Amino acid sequence: VFQPFFMNLIEGILQANPRAMARAMSLIENQDPQARDILKALFPSTGRALVIGVTGAPGSGKSTLVDKLAHEFRRQGKTVGIVAVDPTSPFSGGAILADRVRMSAHYNDGGVFIRSMATRGHLGGLSRAAAQILSVLDAAGKDIILLETVGVGQDEIEVVKVADVSLVVLVPGMGDDVQAFKAGIMEIGDIFVLNKADYPQVE
């Protein structure tokens, strides 16, 4: 029999209560024993959100693009969840939270939920718990979930496993063409975005 706390938490998530969502995400990230039961209870309410993975090299402008996409989806009347996977601070073990600073314009918008996560040393561009965090946002009824990875390297292509659409952000001048197409990341993209297109290298 589930405890009242558990039932209230599940009910809160299904009603898109930000506090309940944040609490569940913290339990998931901290590998709390209750996390498994939470995800099991939420599972029947998942599978409706469109998950867009945004990946690319460090400094390519992923956060800015995610911010603009969120603005556009909100303009269309859709609710948005944003999961920004940040590098882990070597001192605190937590997320550096650089991405949330860039997305501050959404803080007062009840239709946008933003969560930063630390990789906690996990290779692959995604936190171990990222897919489970997506389930919470999905169950909460978010129409669109934007998943921004850590600036990835050649082998860090986990985003394709959890995203419905993979969006790769490229910047002119960052490595020659051969290097780019050797990289595994070029093989996973459904959409390629050439950012900072006003750079002289574009020509």
Q: Each PLM stretch: what is its role?
A:
Residues 8-52, 60, 69-155, 162-177:
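Nucleotide-state-sensitive switch-loop elements of NTP-binding domains
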Residues 57:
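P-loop (Walker A) phosphate-binding loop of NTP-binding proteins
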Residues 65:
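Hydrophobic positions on the alpha1 helix immediately C-terminal to the Walker A/P-loop
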Residues 182:
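Conserved SF2 helicase motif VI
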